[in-house]
Swiss-Prot record:
Signal peptide: none
Organism: Arabidopsis thaliana
Keyword Ribonucleoprotein: yes
An MF annotation (GO) of this entry: structural constituent of ribosome
Protein name, as recorded: Large ribosomal subunit protein eL30x
Length: 112
């Protein structure tokens, strides 16, 4: 019960930091634009939903490893990640280019 409560609280913390990034920072949503941001070395942190296809996930993780960028696996599915971003569509992966006022890059562990 305690672990579940702690996981829920950290999940809410990620969501609030992500909402701050959406308001004040720069980001790219989607598989193709995430790969483009990794190839151009603009991405600082990558978030991948839990139900992202394994081939896409491994390709994003490979490009992130080459660019030395942290990858965080979001605990929710793509609908949850889209809702956390404040969008009305599904988001399987996103790249944070500029965190803005948020401290999400410092607080999230890179490889989880």
């Amino acid at each position: 019960m305690v672990a579940e409560k702690k996981a829920k609280k950290s999940h809410e913390g990620i969501n609030s930091r992500l909402a701050l990034v959406m308001k004040s920072g720069k980001y790219t949503l989607g598989y193709k634009s995430v790969l483009k941001s990794l190839r151009s070395s603009k991405g600082k942190l990558i978030l991948i939903s839990s139900n992202c296809p394994p081939l896409r996930r491994s390709e994003i993780e490979y490009y992130a490893m080459l660019a030395k960028v942290g990858v965080h696996r979001y605990n929710g599915n793509n609908v949850d990640l889209g809702t956390a971003c404040g969008k009305y569509f599904r988001v399987s992966c996103l790249s944070i280019v500029d965190p803005g006022d948020s401290d999400i890059i410092k607080t999230l562990p890179g490889d989880q």
